[in-house]
């Protein structure tokens, strides 16, 4: 029987603002739903749209656009200090309550989404059943250090061009943008040309970079925003649910970047996609979805016993 998607869109009131969300599948199916947290901060749900495929397994999938982005309320005049990890944690909890799933849910956070998901999971919410940090940093200083290492391995002149414009602050110079794209094509998304949903997200960031610039910076690898010193290392052992770490062989989230997840979380496993960079859900879509579904089916079963720290 062919799977027919049941799709519902709506808005969750978040104080004076609105959080747009979409549910693919049936929240009343009895199977643990998966909440997908997009990256950035400042991106949109579009580029992680592929995770809707998971709904065919019976796990409903919730996408949402974080405040300031996509179809949610935009606040371009807010001071950079407004945009905090705490704000986005509150928004996530508000969405879980709005959808009435706070007693039973799993989280998949991609890139920054995994950072936010880590902060959420560290607090040990009672309804969280599983956590999937996909291509996510654990320490921004390590992230930047690894990005600098990867930059130096790019074709001749690219790193020097990036460095020249970063020193001058000329981030909108066409030469800088072109050099940045070389890095992105190697370590962010290796599907060329970029799929429409990926291009749509980057276009949305360009149209309103408020959150991205405030918290991250002008590019993936030049982090000068409020997250520049963020880290979850030393705190990840508090995560007490089954965890699946996802990354790509060519990922800017290198093995060194994701290693603390593997070292600190008691019940953890790692899926490394050999033909992917930062977006295995796009670059190896079928294999990635299969891995996620297999994990959810295993650990969200009533028979599963969570591994504890020894």
Swiss-Prot record:
List, alphabetically, the InterPro entries matched: AB_hydrolase_1, AB_hydrolase_fold, AB_hydrolase_sf, Peptidase_S33, Pro_imino_pep
What positions does UniProt annotate as the active site of this protein?
A: 111 (nucleophile), 251, 278 (proton donor)
Superkingdom of source: Bacteria
Pfam families in UniProt: Abhydrolase_1
* Activity's dependence on pH: Optimum pH is 9.0. Stable from pH 6.0 to 9.5.
Q: How is its activity regulated?
A: Completely inhibited by ZnSO(4), ZnCl(2), AgNO(3), CdCl(2) and HgCl(2). Partially inhibited by PbCl(2), NiCl(2) and CoCl(2). Unaffected by LiBr, H(2)BO(3), NaCl, MgSO(4), AlCl(3), KCl, CaCl(2), CrCl(3), MnCl(2), FeSO(4), Fe(NH(4))(2)(SO(4))(2), CuSO(4), RbCl, Na(2)MoO(4), (NH(4))(6)Mo(7)O(24), SnCl(2), CsCl and BaCl(2). Completely inhibited by phenylhydrazine, but not by the other carbonyl reagents hydroxylamine, hydrazine, D,L-penicillamine and D-cycloserine. Unaffected by the chelating agents o-phenanthroline, 8-hydroxyquinoline, enthylenediaminetetraacetic acid and alpha,alpha'-dipyridyl.
A GO cellular component term found in this entry reads: membrane
Q: Where is the AB hydrolase-1 domain?
A: 33-284
Q: Which UniProt keywords apply?
A: Hydrolase
Principal EC category: hydrolase
- Please state which protein family the record places this protein in: Belongs to the peptidase S33 family.
Q: What does this protein do?
A: Hydrolyzes L-prolinamide, L-proline-p-nitroanilide, L-alaninamide, L-methioninamide, piperidine-2-carboxamide and piperazine-2-carboxamide. Has a much lower activity towards piperazine-2-tert-butylcarboxamide. Does not hydrolyze dipeptides and D-prolinamide.
NCBIfam families on file? pro_imino_pep_2
Q: How does it assemble?
A: Monomer.
What is the name listed in the Swiss-Prot or TrEMBL entry for this protein? L-amino acid amidase
Q: Which organism is it from?
A: Pseudomonas azotoformans
């Amino acid at each position: 029987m062919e799977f027919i998607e049941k799709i519902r869109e709506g808005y969750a009131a978040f104080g004076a603002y609105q959080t747009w969300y979409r549910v693919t599948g049936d929240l009343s199916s009895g199977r643990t739903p998966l909440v997908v947290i997009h990256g950035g901060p400042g991106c949109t749900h579009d580029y992680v749209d592929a995770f809707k495929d998971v709904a065919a397994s019976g796990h409903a999938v919730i996408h949402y656009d974080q405040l300031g982005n996509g179809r949610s309320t935009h606040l371009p005049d807010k001071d950079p200090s407004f945009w905090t990890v705490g704000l986005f944690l509150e928004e996530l909890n508000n969405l879980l309550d709005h959808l009435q799933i706070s007693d039973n849910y799993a989280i998949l956070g991609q890139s920054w989404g995994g950072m936010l998901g880590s902060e959420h999971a560290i607090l040990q919410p009672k309804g969280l059943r599983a956590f999937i940090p996909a291509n996510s940093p654990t320490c921004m200083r390590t992230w930047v250090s690894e990005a600098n290492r990867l930059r130096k391995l790019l074709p001749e002149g690219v790193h020097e061009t990036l460095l020249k414009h970063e020193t001058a602050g000329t981030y909108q110079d066409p030469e800088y943008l072109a050099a940045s794209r070389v890095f992105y094509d190697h370590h962010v998304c290796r599907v060329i040309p970029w799929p429409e949903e990926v291009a749509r997200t980057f276009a949305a960031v360009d149209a309103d970079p408020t959150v991205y610039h405030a918290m991250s910076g002008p590019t993936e690898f030049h982090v000068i925003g409020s997250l520049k010193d963020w880290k979850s290392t030393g705190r990840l052992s508090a995560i007490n649910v089954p965890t699946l770490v996802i990354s790509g062989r060519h990922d800017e989230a290198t093995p060194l970047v994701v290693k603390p997840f593997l070292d600190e979380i008691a019940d953890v496993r790692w899926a490394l996609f050999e033909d992917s960079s930062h977006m295995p859900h796009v670059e190896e879509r079928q294999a990635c979805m299969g891995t996620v579904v297999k994990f959810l089916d295993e650990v969200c079963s009533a028979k599963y016993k969570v591994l504890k720290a020894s």
